[in-house]
Amino acid sequence: MRSALHRPSPPRLASPTVLIGQGFALWKLRVIGDRLDLNSDIVDLIEDCERRTVNNTTLDLVIALSYGSRKELTNVVKNLAKKSVTGEISVDEIDESMITQCLETSDIPDPDLLIRTSGEKRISNFLLWQLAYAELVFIDCLWPDFNETEFTSAISEFSRRERRFGSTV
């Protein structure tokens, strides 16, 4: 593993608008996170890209900007508490399904696999609710060094696992 100081610079990416026009035409862009923390020009660009891709169905590309799962879950709890206080819902109606429906990712399937690079063995406040039954694969290489070989290795490890979705048997 190379250190960050000796790693070549990652290639520069084109702007999202250029990417959409050059191959992302079938992808739906979704950005999750707190947009209030972002510059208004960035928010405008995000919203423009999301609008342009809203009807694309080949792939959902989800980018997390200014996202924290604890903050997301706190917002869900606050919103459900407000609805309970105003009588829109009763406390007894609140269940896993209702919470899931209130998440930013409510219309996206939960991940089957999380590949974590850099050798870190943690999920770092990322999709805490959504990763409940995901398989986790930890890769020692740093993100800029992650390549097809690393990806294939992670998929191979994932395919050898017996998924139990919370069952202990």
What are these regions (language model features)?
Residues 1-169:
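Flexible, compositionally biased loop and terminal segments
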